[in-house]
C-alpha cells in the first residue's frame, strides 16, 4: 500500500517539476481516487512548490517558472481541499502598492499549512486592514510592504489597531523587501519574515503565543 502511495506521489512530483499542468492534475486525481490522503497530497504540493521557490531564488528558475509552479500549487491545494477546522485565521494583504507575487506565495503556503486565509489583495490601506480585523476577527494580520514610500503605512496600521482597541486581540506579522527585523520591532509588530518559509514558521509561532496568552 505504501509503495502504491509513493508511486502516485512520485507521478505528481514528476509532472509538477516538468510543468505539465494537466498531467499533474490527472495524477493528483488518480492518487486521491486510490486512497492517498488529502493531507499527504497537500503536503507533497507544498514541498514541490518550496523546491520551485528555492530554484527561483537561486536563479535556476525564471519568474515564468515560478508563476507556473504557483498555478500548479493552487490546483493541487484545490483538489486536496478537505473540510477540516482551520488551526487559525490570517488576514493578508500588500500595503499601498500593486505587488502581489510574494503575498500570493505566502497565502498559498499558509493555506497548505492549515490556516484559513483572507486575502485583501493589493493596494490595501491601514483602514481596510482594521475594518477586516473587526469583521473577520483573525488571529494574525500579515501585512507586506514592497516599496520604501509605503513603510509608514505599516506603522499607521499598527497604530490604528491600537487606537481601536484591537491590538491585543491579534498578532501582527510584517514583511516585504524593504522591511527588517529592526523595523518590525520599531513599529511594534509581533513578528517579521524575510522569506516565505520564514513567514509560515513565524505565523505558527505567533499562533502558539496567542493561544498561550503571550
Would you name each region that the model predicts?
Residues 87-120:
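Glycine-rich active-site/cofactor-binding loop and its immediate structural neighborhood
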Residues 85-88, 167:
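Short, flexible coil/linker segments at domain boundaries that flank nucleotide/cofactor-interacting
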Residues 109-112, 119-189, 202:
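Cofactor-cradling patches in redox/metallo enzymes
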Residues 202-214:
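A charged, well-structured terminal subsegment
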Residues 190-195:
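Short acidic-hydrophobic, aromatic-tinged amphipathic segments that line or gate anion-handling sites
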Residues 80-86, 131-135:
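Glycine-rich phosphate/diphosphate-binding loops that line cofactor/substrate pockets in enzymes
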Residues 34, 62, 98-99, 150:
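Alpha-helix N-cap/loop-to-helix initiation residues
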Residues 1-83:
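Long amphipathic alpha-helical segments
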Amino acid at each position: 500500500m505504501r509503495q502504491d502511495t509513493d508511486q502516485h506521489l512520485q507521478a505528481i512530483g514528476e509532472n509538477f517539476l516538468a510543468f505539465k499542468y494537466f498531467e499533474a492534475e490527472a495524477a493528483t486525481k488518480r492518487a486521491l481516487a486510490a486512497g492517498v490522503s488529502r493531507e499527504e497530497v497537500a503536503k507533497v504540493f507544498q514541498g514541490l512548490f518550496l523546491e520551485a521557490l528555492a530554484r527561483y531564488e537561486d536563479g535556476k528558475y525564471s519568474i515564468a517558472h515560478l508563476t507556473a509552479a504557483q498555478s500548479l500549487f493552487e490546483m493541487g491545494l484545490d483538489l486536496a481541499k478537505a473540510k477540516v477546522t482551520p488551526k487559525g485565521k490570517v488576514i493578508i494583504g500588500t500595503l499601498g502598492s500593486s505587488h502581489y507575487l510574494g503575498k500570493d506565495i505566502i497565502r498559498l503556503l499558509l493555506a497548505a499549512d492549515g490556516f484559513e486565509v483572507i486575502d485583501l489583495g493589493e493596494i490595501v490601506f491601514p483602514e481596510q486592514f482594521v475594518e477586516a480585523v473587526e469583521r473577520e476577527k483573525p488571529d494574525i494580520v500579515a501585512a507586506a510592504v514592497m516599496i520604501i514610500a509605503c513603510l509608514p503605512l505599516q506603522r499607521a496600521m499598527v497604530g490604528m489597531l491600537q487606537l481601536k482597541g484591537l491590538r491585543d486581540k491579534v498578532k501582527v506579522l510584517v514583511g516585504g523587501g524593504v522591511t527588517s527585523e529592526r523595523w518590525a520591532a520599531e513599529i511594534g509588530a509581533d513578528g517579521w519574515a524575510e522569506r516565505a518559509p520564514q513567514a509560515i514558521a513565524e505565523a505558527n509561532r505567533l499562533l502558539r503565543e496567542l493561544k498561550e496568552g503571550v
